[in-house]
Amino acid sequence: MTALSKSKEIIDQTSHYGANNYHPLPIVISEALGAWVKDPEGNEYMDMLSAYSAVNQGHRHPKIIQALKDQADKITLTSRAFHNDQLGPFYEKTAKLTGKEMILPMNTGAEAVESAVKAARRWAYEVKGVADNQAEIIACVGNFHGRTMLAVSLSSEEEYKRGFGPMLPGIKLIPYGDVEALRQAITPNTAAFLFEPIQGEAGIVIPPEGFLQEAAAICKEENVLFIADEIQTGLGRTGKTFACDWDGIVPDMYILGKALGGGVFPISCIAADREILGVFNPGSHGSTFGGNPLACAVSIASLEVLEDEKLADRSLELGEYFKSELESIDSPVIKEVRGRGLFIGVELTEAARPYCERLKEEGLLCKETHDTVIRFAPPLIISKEDLDWAIEKIKHVLRNA
């Protein structure tokens, strides 16, 4: 076997044994550091996806990796049958970051969404007084909250639902950004309005100005929980600690994941006050790995990196520069550039995938979303020099469309 065949061998092996539920670009990543990755042949590429914003702190950040190693040498898993010495510090760190009184830890973003809806439903029955089994959740058209049965039931994408029915009941969808539709959808049985402050998978869609403030006010007036899915937008990605900060709103509940584990270990959580998360009692919810000491130690280090290195400020500054450079590109295929911080979408007049493939050939890795949008979301630790390198590659590909 020659070195040149290694990537193809791995891709063939993956295709042969793996379920065909992904369509990745034809590249194998075998090593990474900071904003750069390598394939088995030693070719370097810039990562402009950050594992869908899970790698905000950069690949293999030394502080996070050290926390992983140190904790792995002590204990990795206890289950929640016993206390562990990392869970309390993780709770306190995350509670102070979010300004909430209680934290419930899980592993993946989709699990955290499930936990949020379970909490909202039980809150509706025990606190709001909704009749049993009548609680409703309102979500938005174009949302993405994961791939579990709840998440696909929340989705408006038929392809996500096809062949997986029946969907879960008690869900209503409104157009993203439509205040009147939200007002009309609320009934006495409404438990929560679940939203993304910026819709990522829909193509980096920013809500109309004033929508989130008005939605928050309506939910407060109607005694409906206002729940923000900040799994992808939170923790510095948009140039603020949370994307909700752009609109000056504080949700009743945050859903966090991805960068909470620094791109090193899966951990997610929901954060809310005692009135909401206090509805859980022993046995009502759980996870064997949720809140495990390894994940908690990694998460504490990941949050410290975000704070100590002021990555939200860095995202804001570099994001404004990056967006302005993208807007200056004279290309017949660019329809719109939108985004906040280092969370930017370039909408094209045609399919985006061929352009992602061309950018890969130029040494830059990104991914299409919603068919016609190229999503650019590099690690927040990226240097301006590296960003300038990427900008030149993007200009070259889009100008020569």
Curated annotation (Swiss-Prot):
Keywords: Amino-acid biosynthesis, Aminotransferase, Arginine metabolism, Cytoplasm, Proline biosynthesis, Pyridoxal phosphate, Transferase. Disruption phenotype: Cells lacking this gene do not grow in minimal medium containing either arginine or ornithine as sole nitrogen source. The modification N6-(pyridoxal phosphate)lysine is found at residue 258. Its main location: cytoplasm. Belongs to the class-III pyridoxal-phosphate-dependent aminotransferase family. OAT subfamily. PANTHER family: AMINOTRANSFERASE CLASS III, ORNITHINE AMINOTRANSFERASE, MITOCHONDRIAL. Catalyzes the interconversion of ornithine to glutamate semialdehyde. This is Ornithine aminotransferase. The lineage of its organism: Bacteria, Bacillati, Bacillota, Bacilli, Bacillales.
